[in-house]
Amino acid sequence: MADIKTAVAKTKNARISPFKVRQVLALIRGKSAERAQVILKFSDKRAAGIILKVLNSAMANAEHKYGMDMDKLYVHEAFADQGPVMKRFRPVSMGRAHPYVHKLTHITVKLCERQQEAK
């Protein structure tokens, strides 16, 4: 397993909840890179657009940095980590304010080449 090349792309502080991103990442995990692109393009989730940019970046990294075969690429790992939160206040009645947070997310996509099994 040590000789397997991996292409990685990350985005930090994406302004979307990690829960919402993880729902979309579950759809593409383990799929071929081209199939994952199609899934993300036709998804109506807002997170899909952000993840598509990260996936395209990982595919470009695989081709230019490592010379990997684009037809053999698949999504080896895809995960979202909790980023920092931005605390905000919403004004409510009687001069009060209720706190809420904007959650930020770190998204990572790792691509590998599929190995042909010897028979």
PLM regions: where:
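Short, charged/polar surface micro-motifs in flexible loops or helix N-caps
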Residues: 81-85
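Ribosome large-subunit tunnel/peptidyl-transferase-proximal elements
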Residues: 1-80, 105-119
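Short, low-complexity, polybasic intrinsically disordered segments
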Residues: 86-96
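Short, electropositive, low-hydrophobicity segments enriched in small/polar residues
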Residues: 34, 87, 99
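C-terminal structural segments of small proteins and small subunits
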Residues: 95-103
